[in-house]
Amino acid sequence: MVDIIKTNATFKAGKGNKGTLSFEIPAKQISSGIDQAFNKQKDKINIPGFRKGHVSKELFLARFGEEALYEDALNAILPDIYDQAVNEADITVVGQPQIIPDDLKHGGPSKIHAEVTLAPTVELGDYKGVEVEKESDEVSDKELNAELERLQKGEAELVPAKEDQVSEKGDTVVIDFDGSVDGKQFDGGKAQNFSLSLGSGQFIPGFEDQLVGHKAGDDVDVKVTFPKDYQAKNLAGKEAVFAVTIHELKKLETPALDNEFAKDVDDSVLVLEELKAKTKEKLAKDKAEKNKDAFEDAAIQKVVDGAKINPEKLPEEMINDDVSRQMQTFFNNLAGQGVKPEMYFQIPNQPGAVKATNDRRRTNRVKTNLVLEEIARVEKINPSNEEIDKEIKSLASEYNIKESEVEKSVSAGMLSHDLKVQQAVELIVNSAQAVEKK
């Protein structure tokens, strides 16, 4: 039978959503903590005349005093006792507490004060059967034709232009160019037989535009001004002239939409109508998946928007916790690819593990989590040990790591929380009513 720890917890409200949680650590737990702390340190203890790891606790205490073990003892026993104190005080906290121990006393209970931040309260609106607009999954002729056109462009080939044809955006020109500023050439301003797709934005603004409307064999003086923030400081903001010779003009030639094209695109079909049918089927599947995701997101957002959260300004601790969860997910994804965090940070020019998002998106994500947690509480959603074990197996398989590694990197409490939120989402989505989008 598990002993129930009584902490005599009390909570005193402070300014805003801050406050002080005061509680006691019973003597029995202090004694247990000191034992754990000694066992942790004993292999490192070095006393003349004794081998490492063979010093008794009594000798250690006589030599160094209990105080030498207090920090490790507190670290060992505090998490569970703090959680019990929070439950006794009937409060919901966010972030990490700032612990202020009075002092540890082996023979009696020790008083602890913790500066804590209270979680905002949530007043739910409707969350079952909410009506949400949903796009039709039907594929229109316009959408099908656009996809067929995209497939045609994918099979297009560059062919030499006819003599009377002029260059347009999307065409490719093969050019020589020689640039100068104030009549003087500059490094990197000259090339021969350079292949340039007009409209690609490879060159500074204005350069490609001035090559539109010309034929192969034309000589063109292109006049441009380098941007003020141009990487070469000696050219930034300066006017330049490029002497350009167009050697070749090539245009994209798209194949005809016929049976031969259909067989080139998909060797499992024989005629164009088969390709159209398969393409339409794929578009419908993709559209249905996209609409499903949008419908679910809209249903959840409607529930979040219908809830009242007090205070409206979320504690910074909640934002920080959210960022930590994102980082955990990010590094779990890396682990699934065989990349350790230290390996990632050694790669040059890598972005941060969690890209910065604007305050509104961050706040909405935390609000969503609060609302889902409240729904889970009201609906008494409590994942079973079997469900948690199943999730551990699923994560191990997804990230290609051992189950023991999942258990090390993600606590059972975090897994339980994620499953609660997931089941709250399912409750909202499964009961939501789809209405035709106007």
Curated annotation (Swiss-Prot):
List the InterPro entries hit by this protein, alphabetically.
PPIase_dom_sf, PPIase_FKBP_dom, Trig_fac, Trigger_fac_C, Trigger_fac_C_sf, Trigger_fac_ribosome-bd_bac, Trigger_fac_ribosome-bd_sf, Trigger_fact/SurA_dom_sf
Among the Pfam families in the record, one is: FKBP_C
This chain's protein is named Trigger factor
- Entry keyword set: Cell cycle, Cell division, Chaperone, Cytoplasm, Isomerase, Rotamase
Catalytic activity of the protein: [protein]-peptidylproline (omega=180) = [protein]-peptidylproline (omega=0)
Q: Name one GO biological process term.
A: cell division
PROSITE patterns the record matches: FKBP_PPIASE (PS50059)
At the highest ranks, the source species' classification is: Bacteria, Bacillati, Bacillota, Bacilli, Lactobacillales
Q: Where in the cell is it found?
A: Cytoplasm
Q: Which GO terms describe its molecular function?
A: peptidyl-prolyl cis-trans isomerase activity; protein folding chaperone; ribosome binding
What family does the entry list? Belongs to the FKBP-type PPIase family. Tig subfamily.
Q: Which SUPFAM superfamilies match?
A: FKBP-like, Triger factor/SurA peptide-binding domain-like, Trigger factor ribosome-binding domain
- As recorded in UniProt, its EC number(s) are 5.2.1.8
Query: What are the residue boundaries of the PPIase FKBP-type domain, all occurrences included?
Result: 170-255
| Domain remarks in the Swiss-Prot or TrEMBL record | Consists of 3 domains; the N-terminus binds the ribosome, the middle domain has PPIase activity, while the C-terminus has intrinsic chaperone activity on its own.
- Which domain of life does this protein belong to? Bacteria
Task of the protein: Involved in protein export. Acts as a chaperone by maintaining the newly synthesized protein in an open conformation. Functions as a peptidyl-prolyl cis-trans isomerase.
| Primary gene name | tig
Example of a GO cellular component annotation carried by this entry: cytoplasm
